[in-house]
Amino acid sequence: MASSSAPVHPARYLSVFLVMLIGIYLLVFFTGDKHTAPKLGIDLQGGTRVTLTARTPDGSAPSREALAQAQQIISARVNGLGVSGSEVVVDGDNLVITVPGNDGSEARNLGQTARLYIRPVLNSMPAQPAAEEPQPAPSAEPQPPGQPAAPPPAQSGAPASPQPGAQPRPYPQDPAPSPNPTSPASPPPAPPAEAPATDPRKDLAERIAQEKKLRQSTNQYMQMVALQFQATRCESDDILAGNDDPKLPLVTCSTDHKTAYLLAPSIISGDQIQNATSGMDQRGIGYVVDLQFKGPAANIWADYTAAHIGTQTAFTLDSQVVSAPQIQEAIPGGRTQISGGDPPFTAATARQLANVLKYGSLPLSFEPSEAQTVSATLGLSSLRAGMIAGAIGLLLVLVYSLLYYRVLGLLTALSLVASGSMVFAILVLLGRYINYTLDLAGIAGLIIGIGTTADSFVVFFERIKDEIREGRSFRSAVPRGWARARKTIVSGNAVTFLAAAVLYFLAIGQVKGFAFTLGLTTILDLVVVFLVTWPLVYLASKSSLLAKPAYNGLGAVQQVARERRAMARTGRG
């Protein structure tokens, strides 16, 4: 037990808490999106639903194992800590993602395949606006019917160089069949009742295969043709996205649509990344993604950068160039950075990229649908009911404290206000930085946290009563009571926190949110009791006014102490 005669500096404790509270609210008002309210879960606010349709390079149906793995990875991306309130479910060959709020782009980005490769840059050229479809020029020599005027490069053994302003095709379109002039005329076949249905998967697989044939050719002349052509369609969606072969060269565009690149085969892939984090660059003027490679990749990167100083190296994500910096020096240690293009990374985009790289690439590529709004399953009425329940619980605690402890009950109220202020600010920051959303289960955890905080006050005040029963004054009973109570308070909160931790790690769904808020309020209860309640009660014990039983509610206890002393004197007499 700590000595009750040790010097106490309550102003220091209160100052520490005020500095913490001010610092947290500065973060709330001056960082991030500056939204000053906690994010609400799907059950209270509604959300956005996006369906991701799996696509495979060969057009086959995705396997159950691949879909389950993709579901697990996307769940980790959107709900890494289990407190975002998002849902990822398998629906046939699709994954359905539901996230709180109305940001459909965020939900679609979760389906990003996130296949990262580091490729040396062989050539590049500025992107050019796509020219309108050229009209066929008159020719002195007639073309055979049904034959295209200029064979496309992808199918020509010695393709002609593309003319300036012309827009070559990446692959030929099947010409319409024409009648053979040498064959006798025959009646046209009867038109079918219905056009044969095409398989979208097979059609997409053919388009991907033709893109690979054009943009991943090993022929140098074909590479230059593909580079010139790709420069005219950087603004278009990339059919190849996430399906390029890392062992072959690649012609692609940057994510800012300003440059087309010819890239060599990959030297390092994303599965060789050990960790990815986001933060400010060394100059403090922009955001970057820091990568840490695994052992073999770290050696490869160190050797490569040492041997290729002055050359350009591209970081491709899902077949597009995210960053293409010039190597200035050898980079040992297995670490490197990815900086954004134009526009540069924001805190949100850098964090999102680091998140998808950290949890790995998907085994499948997905095509997202349009975002759909999902209505709240419970709605604001449930939120209002939860808040009313919390207010009633708080009011009962305050009434009990005022009736039983008088002025000390006011100190309880101040401590609860301090705790609530800190909880609110932390919930705002958690929603901003780890995507925490407050649902009905989380509100239940907060309400139980009020009871935990009140329990700490009761333990402290009852220990003070015990000291007064033993004959001590209110002034001397407070430090001695605190020395005895704090161990009990820490032990009780430790048990509650342990229960919350077990729930958090073993449960799924909304139970995680309940356990998270319960654990959070338990930790903050200790902070408030040590930095606010104890110093305030100590200051109150120095007041001659509050030492009066009419104000501190300890008259009955002091009467018991007087009776004990009288009995002791009678026994000695």
Swiss-Prot record:
GO terms for cellular component: cytosol; peptidoglycan-based cell wall; plasma membrane. Pfam families: Sec_GG, SecD_SecF_C, SecDF_P1_head. Residues 135-154, 161-194 have a biased composition (Pro residues). The keyword Lipid metabolism does not apply. InterPro entries: SecD, SecD/SecF_arch_bac, SecD/SecF_CS, SecD_SecF_C, SecD_SecF_C_bact, SecDF_P1_head. One of its GO terms (biological process) is intracellular protein transmembrane transport. The chain crosses the membrane at residues 13-33, 385-405, 410-430, 441-461, 489-509, 514-534. Its main location: membrane. Residues 127-200 are annotated as: Disordered. It is found in: Cell membrane. Keywords: Cell membrane, Membrane, Protein transport, Translocation, Transmembrane, Transmembrane helix, Transport. Gene3D superfamilies: 3.30.1360.200, 3.30.70.3220, Multidrug efflux transporter AcrB transmembrane domain. It is a multi-pass membrane protein. One of its GO terms (molecular function) is protein-transporting ATPase activity. Coiled coil: none annotated. It comes from the Bacteria. PANTHER family: PROTEIN TRANSLOCASE SUBUNIT SECD, PROTEIN-EXPORT MEMBRANE PROTEIN SEC. Part of the Sec protein translocase complex. Interacts with the SecYEG preprotein conducting channel. SecDF uses the proton motive force (PMF) to complete protein translocation after the ATP-dependent function of SecA. Belongs to the SecD/SecF family. SecD subfamily. Forms a complex with SecF. Part of the essential Sec protein translocation apparatus which comprises SecA, SecYEG and auxiliary proteins SecDF. Other proteins may also be involved. This is Protein translocase subunit SecD.
